[in-house]
Amino acid sequence: MSQKFDVVVIGAGPGGYVAAIRAAQLGLKTACIEKYIGKEGKVALGGTCLNVGCIPSKALLDSSYKYHEAKEAFKVHGIEAKGVTIDVPAMVARKANIVKNLTGGIATLFKANGVTSFEGHGKLLANKQVEVTGLDGKTQVLEAENVIIASGSRPVEIPPAPLTDDIIVDSTGALEFQAVPKKLGVIGAGVIGLELGSVWARLGAEVTVLEALDKFLPAADEQIAKEALKVLTKQGLNIRLGARVTASEVKKKQVTVTFTDANGEQKETFDKLIVAVGRRPVTTDLLAADSGVTLDERGFIYVDDHCKTSVPGVFAIGDVVRGAMLAHKASEEGVMVAERIAGHKAQMNYDLIPSVIYTHPEIAWVGKTEQTLKAEGVEVNVGTFPFAASGRAMAANDTTGLVKVIADAKTDRVLGVHVIGPSAAELVQQGAIGMEFGTSAEDLGMMVFSHPTLSEALHEAALAVNGHAIHIANRKKR
């Protein structure tokens, strides 16, 4: 006899496990299916984000930055550190231990909330039945009143640079290097490429980033992107725009990459090559032919604004549907869907999903860019404030970057907050909170911010929108 559940979730990544926990909290009998095998040879919860994405990459970013600080930044504080070295295997092991602790934490949360966990591959059949193929090959069918598909995404592979065991790798492989490559190539100047390139550049690698687009970080505000390109180039990343990779050849533990740019055909030889050209939804053997769920022209599961698929009672969330491939988007979609299944009228504001690139300085934004608003014909007022004028940033010797606030010229409503600088990921969230409640630049300017803090840069940028900044000269007084 098949087991029956109110909710069956396929996938235990940041969308799936959060959806399962919230559904269980709401009193729904919930099951969650996961097939990912971790480094220890066991099923590991948490999806790409926790196992081979967000968390492990941040661990390496933080470790590599501490090494950089010890070598380059301590001396300005009067601290002398001689003979600083890096133990790459130890750094990677620390990362793995963090992942292990967090995946175990999700299992504990499942148990605490009464979520039934199934190990294996989940496949949606007709009539909201879900087939689970266990690790031993045995199958069972679960009956569900509601199904949430959260199967995630995987790295895109490209024909000119097929992956090898250890020379040409994707983002997952780039987290496992046991030594610093002398010369590192990265295909793709997106979030993943820049973060991983930064890790190994700080540790001493000569890094070249090949980006096919002619524009750097096209989704970011142009002023912020321009500043980011300047800063990252100064840090040693050789970012080649308009560079389209056409071939690669592995020979004697190195790879020679052929690409074309404005100067014609070029060749570069690297010790390692990271392919970071984006991700694609995981739908392989996910949907039976008679499941009724449809895909769009790009292979994503089609959903409406509430993540409903073409089949009543079947939902899809996260990377397998349209929109930004971000863990926090997936998680909040999971909460929204669980609550709607339980009869609540939950909504999600897709216009206020923050984006972050965890380089140093961090790059983060929420809302619309200045160029987008101008293209839409919206008149705006803009305020900026450099961290070079921030007392707290000076005290930390971390003064690169700026905060930018964009407001509607007619209503003063804040339409975008963009940051490059220390703690940008945290600062932009303050802007997001205000924007969620319809804040104006004047509202932010009237708030009392603690002193001295990096947050004061947001305060001053908001004041600058209307020409009222205190700690910089205002370009325009209104």
From Swiss-Prot:
Subcellular location: Cytoplasm
Catalytic activity line of the entry: N(6)-[(R)-dihydrolipoyl]-L-lysyl-[protein] + NAD(+) = N(6)-[(R)-lipoyl]-L-lysyl-[protein] + NADH + H(+)
Gene Ontology CC terms: cytoplasm
Cysteines paired by S-S bonds: C49-C54
Co-factor: note: Binds 1 FAD per subunit.
Keywords: Cytoplasm, Disulfide bond, FAD, Flavoprotein, NAD, Oxidoreductase, Redox-active center
Subunit text: Homodimer.
Note: The active site is a redox-active disulfide bond.
Summary of the function given for this chain in its UniProt record: The branched-chain alpha-keto dehydrogenase complex catalyzes the overall conversion of alpha-keto acids to acyl-CoA and CO(2). It contains multiple copies of 3 enzymatic components: branched-chain alpha-keto acid decarboxylase (E1), lipoamide acyltransferase (E2) and lipoamide dehydrogenase (E3). Also acts in the glycine cleavage system.
NCBIfam families: lipoamide_DH
Protein name: Dihydrolipoyl dehydrogenase
Species per Swiss-Prot/TrEMBL record: Pseudomonas aeruginosa (strain ATCC 15692 / DSM 22644 / CIP 104116 / JCM 14847 / LMG 12228 / 1C / PRS 101 / PAO1)
